[in-house]
């Protein structure tokens, strides 16, 4: 499990708060990040992101109770009309399946969807861009009118940086000056290179283009332009002190405003680049003292690399803000492990007045006059936190808190003082303290007012790249802040993909870059398409153009300064990559693991979260002892050993337990928030089990037992990585250099400690004569991970950095705990033991030593296992870093890898090259590395190389001025015109799954053998047009009494696919290439259901119809139908729904109470059988039935036409769907209550009630009384007939279609032998007397199809039959079968009710046809589910969804190929 700092879990939170963190983690796993998160665009083999994985965090995602709508994945293949805007409620799948193109491999380039025209952009986007344009124009005007003696930027604003549109700003009349030159041809930069005459600003005025020319006196040299590419105030030649040593902040201010200077102690400390950063913050957040009072301000991103002193710049700006503006409160949200560091920085640079000595001079040191409040681990209760917040609001000043603390205090669902632990059974009633509840509500209101609405005057987010998942609850909470003055501090603005960058920019400048879809079309896809070595020349050109445009759009409020600033002031830094060979045991384990994965097919690499594989492989290539220990302990939390942020969520993870503690199984599931390919909560595996427990979702190590049977632990040489690590440690100590070792695996850190305890320390310089010493923790080495308390961290860091400390030489750190807010300049050597998925983490780890204060040359060693997944991850790091350099730094890194190399994670080499006997060390200058190559050449696959060599800036690829203008021009033209690109599918084509490895035999069976499989089925496209809402799907219990357990619930549904196939059901696993949206209804509590593109689903086709089963257990019944028939009351009639006869439900649980009395106003009234409505509907039925018989064709799909209550359904024949839907009946549309006859024979029942399924009659009829008496007496028909061929069902028996239906043409009129079980509440003439010849076969006492039910003659016959009635056999329209029992089903679960159907009868008019289907209906619609009793104690719980249905009808001429997805969800 990722440790505390990695997750950022707040140590100042009590255990209840930690539970909230776990909830955040679980919720951010469910995002979509689409997320990603957002890691949501970071799917394993995601063709959209070079990250490939993400969530979300993950996640992520709206985790509060009121979840916001998910962002539509930019890689989703659903068709989006170009008119779609941000606030549209629905996404229509309008793409014609005939127009779909063949899918492309993931590594190939992708086309770009239609771009939105300029007039289709969101108004908020236009307004945001216009505001920024006007702000920059005002600043430029001030620079011209009030020129400072020492300007900070060139006096002339770079002309090509301003691109105006007529709709965005006032038009300027074209003017031509004598010295101007108009350049109409921008295809080449030769003219610009030959001449330094003039710049050109392109202005578009709607219909025509007008060129406005700027005088040549305002042109800017190429060198100045180079300096401008990092944003404003980046020219350090102008960021200088004045003659008196002061630092003026508000350059070019109006004369009526006062000069704003830094405090003297700050002015002496700041460096030129920091002066530029302070001025940059002032320009964006304040702009001018007068405008601060009237405007809401702007946000900005201070993107200085790690170690450039962002904290000092912010402290200096806060001091200026409080001294010269009316601002009163500043909220600083920082990672929890940097809280103490921030407080120490404030006290050092701006000491409190009482901390100053009495003789201090104001001209030397100015104390702060504001207070610094902090919420840390000392504030355990909500009341104490509320007091700190209230003091901050009343007194003003700065409030420091962690990200998780802010989320907990601002999200309504998170705030709680304590949470009672979940128990299996409550022995006493729950007592609710109303006064405490009122206090909690008051605290919540106070927090919301102080932190969000209206919130502080300025918000500062340190390490702001954590705001990378637009749907993560932390991001959502931050965006709720009303203040627009938002500052993000980050040394790594672009980590994994451009969507994360967009999310962070969207926080500081909402809507500036448009919606996520607009940004993806304009920038993300073009930039990604040209990133690799196999990209087309057009792709590369467009990539370079769009990278420059994106950089120039943001340079007004994103200031980027890189490590080039540090190189001037710090010693040299050398970063080498050592590619390490695997030992024999490691290679055997790795081969075995890969073999199992490949044999698993789509359920392996393409179906599992790759982070699980990464965890297992990390144990292999770090050292087999780590894998062996996990195998021996059977640690349920093994996959959370990795200290990786994404393993928990895009934003946070649960706190890492202290080393050696046991983690509960339910918290051990490996989340998949690295930008999951789908957004399902827990995607299931091949087994049909939608109720799989999360605790079972773990990685097992059965596959490794045989190889590790006689394994000898404690052998250092079993891992070449470990051998090289100890060589680097010992040689560094011999040279007198302190060294840091970073690993993301906590178990690996523990193993390193074990080996250290067995080895002697090397001889220190000058101490050769002294005896040897052992490595001792907290004496000769330190360890820091997420479980280290904050105060202990500070002590260890200060002690390690102390130059007088000559006993401690080694510091072991977890990558996520030690990469933020830790200053370890006491060391000058770093070993990154394993590569992180996110390159930001390794880069931040390196910068712990390479920062201000470092006195020695720095050496960094990256150990990477070659020919493994780790090498692929390192390659991805290079690609991500190259994209960051290109977009953020406007550099031109080399293209080193093909897209296939980057995106294909499955890297398996059967045979490694032979070990080398020697390595060429001519290019290696560092002595420790030279000695390693000489001593261990057989452990290294190739000569070590510098990490920066893969990121060289190709200055020859730098855009010329003309190319830059062409880039901006093409960008503007693309926005103005709708580019006619085709719109193929952008899906990932890979079914993402979070299933457990235990569900795959290859990983759970020791002697498993792979089975031969045929070719994979082709990927199918399943596209819905209309659908019904998701009703409740009952969970079924075994026949034994009592409440069902989780295990029994699981096993009841977890039958294998081959069982279905043997039973004659076709099961096909396919991958959807487009999002399938299943809209809900206003009358339903269900929101839109969705099957995401790339999700693995099963198509189940049998005699009862066609179904779709998703990987998370949802079942969709596919129907062919068309447009709905308009009912008289203007609403869609809910057909087959059951009203007051249903048992009441509460919170998803079946209630044992009797049904409530029906509301007379809501019940339908009986209709006279002589009414014109009935006669006309009977005639309609007769016509259709006759037409069906006359066709003499194969059975067709019947589509139900709903109508008002009591109205008969019409049938129309619709061709089969593309899925090959079998003939089926409109399931819930035809119920027994809708069976009619013509004129009642004999006049026995003068009243014809066609609405019996809506309610029971107020006064039971004589027929009903007789039915109840017969039911209680238990009349049973004749013995069981021999089986013929039958219907396969999962309950353990088969239903013969012929022997039960030999009397289907018998008259409907009631006879003496009528089956009383099926009478229901309707008059007897509605019932089919001999429709089901044998009740014991329909309601068998035994579930074994081979054991016929024996005769029962006791008085308990009815009870026996009732107790064995499978719940799926209950027809919703027969509520009278058991008068005292209320059925829980609101509609059929399968495709059609076969129990009763309107078969021809002499009782109908003579012109009605006798034509019937091939398989006349006789079964319940619940025939596909296991048998369960009718006892109330056995009725499973149900979700508290309101059940609503929508029927659809169609004419044969309209929408013949429309599909309707009938959903039966949990």
UniProtKB/Swiss-Prot annotation:
It is found in: Nucleus. The keyword rRNA processing does not apply. It catalyses: ATP + H2O = ADP + phosphate + H(+). A motif (LXXLL motif 2) lies at residues 1328-1332. Residues 99-114 have a biased composition (Basic residues). One of its GO terms (molecular function) is protein kinase binding. Residues 727-895 form the Helicase C-terminal domain. The modification Phosphothreonine is found at residue 1259. GO terms for cellular component: nuclear speck; nucleus. InterPro entries: ARIP4-like, ARIP4_DEXHc, Helicase_ATP-bd, Helicase_C-like, P-loop_NTPase, SNF2-like_sf, SNF2/RAD54-like_C, SNF2_N. Residues 1-137, 185-235, 649-670, 1026-1045, 1120-1170, 1184-1212, 1259-1281, 1444-1466 are annotated as: Disordered. Disruption phenotype: Death by 11.5 dpc. At 9.5 dpc and 10.5 dpc, almost all major tissues are proportionally smaller, and the neural tube is shrunk in some embryos. Dramatically reduced cell proliferation and increased apoptosis are observed in 9.5 dpc and 10.5 dpc embryos. Embryonic fibroblasts stop to grow after 2 or 3 passages and exhibit increased apoptosis and decreased DNA synthesis compared with wild-type. Sumoylated. Signal peptide: none annotated. The modification Phosphoserine is found at residues 1168, 1171. Residues 1135-1154 have a biased composition (Polar residues). Expressed at relatively low level, with highest expression in testis, liver and kidney. In brain, it is expressed in hippocampal and cerebellar neurons. In testis, it is present at high level in Sertoli cell nuclei. Also present in Leydig cell (at protein level). The keyword Nucleotide-binding applies. Interacts with AR via its N-terminus. Interacts with DYRK1A. Binds DNA and mononucleosomes, but does not seem to form large multiprotein complexes. DNA helicase that modulates androgen receptor (AR)-dependent transactivation in a promoter-dependent manner. Not able to remodel mononucleosomes in vitro. Acts as an AR-coregulator in Sertoli cells. This is Helicase ARIP4. It comes from Mus musculus (Mouse). The lineage of its organism: Eukaryota, Metazoa, Chordata, Craniata, Vertebrata. The gene is Rad54l2.
